C-alpha cells in the first residue's frame, strides 16, 4: 500500500468517525426531561377527572344513593321537589346546608354559620353549586356531589377544604 492510499484511507476513517460523533447527542441532552406540554397537561387532567369519577361512583354505591350526573360532571339527587319555577340567575334564595368531604368530615354548615344568602349566578359560590341550584325550586331539598373541578380545584379553600377535594352538599332551599 503506497503512502498516498494510506493517507486517503486514514482521511476517510477520520471523517467517518468525526461525522458519527457530531451527529450524536451529548449525554446531558439525551437525559434531560422535556417540559410538560399542553397535550401532557390535558392527559393528566383527563386522568384526574376519570379518577375523581371513580371515587364518586364508589361513594354513591356505598351510600346507596340514586344520583344523576349532569353533562358537566355534577352529581345530584333531588330529595324534595319544592314548588314554583326552577331557580335561575339573579334569583335571591336563603339556603340551609351541610358541606362535607367524601370521608364524612363536616367542613361547613348552616347550623354553625347560619343559612347562606345567595343571588344565583352572582354570589361567590362554587361553580357546581351554582349549576345545582338551577336544578331546584323553592322549598326543594337535594344532595350535590361536586368533583374538585366544580368545587375548589387544585388548591382547596385554604381553610377546611383540602386541595383537590370532592365535596358533598346537603341543601334545603327556603320556600
Question: Which sequence ranges carry the predicted segments?
Answer:
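Cross-family detector of peptidyl-prolyl cis-trans isomerase
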Residues: 6, 23-175
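Sec-dependent bacterial lipoprotein signal peptides
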Residues: 1-21
Amino acid at each position: 500500500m503506497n503512502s498516498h492510499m494510506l493517507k486517503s484511507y486514514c482521511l476517510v476513517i477520520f471523517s467517518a468517525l468525526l461525522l458519527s460523533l457530531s451527529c450524536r447527542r451529548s449525554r446531558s441532552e439525551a437525559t434531560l426531561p422535556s417540559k410538560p406540554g399542553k397535550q401532557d397537561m390535558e392527559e393528566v387532567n383527563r386522568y384526574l377527572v376519570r379518577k375523581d369519577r371513580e371515587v364518586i361512583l364508589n361513594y354513591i354505591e356505598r351510600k346507596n344513593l340514586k344520583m344523576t350526573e349532569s353533562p358537566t360532571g355534577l352529581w345530584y339527587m333531588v330529595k324534595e321537589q319544592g314548588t314554583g319555577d326552577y331557580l335561575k340567575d339573579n334569583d335571591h334564595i336563603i339556603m340551609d346546608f351541610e358541606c362535607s368531604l367524601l370521608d364524612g368530615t363536616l367542613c361547613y354548615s348552616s347550623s354553625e354559620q347560619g343559612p347562606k344568602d345567595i343571588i344565583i349566578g352572582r354570589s361567590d359560590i362554587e361553580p357546581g353549586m351554582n349549576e345545582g341550584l338551577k336544578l331546584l325550586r323553592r322549598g326543594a331539598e337535594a344532595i350535590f356531589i361536586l368533583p374538585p373541578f366544580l368545587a375548589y380545584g387544585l388548591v382547596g379553600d385554604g381553610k377546611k377544604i383540602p386541595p383537590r377535594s370532592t365535596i358533598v352538599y346537603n341543601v334545603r332551599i327556603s320556600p
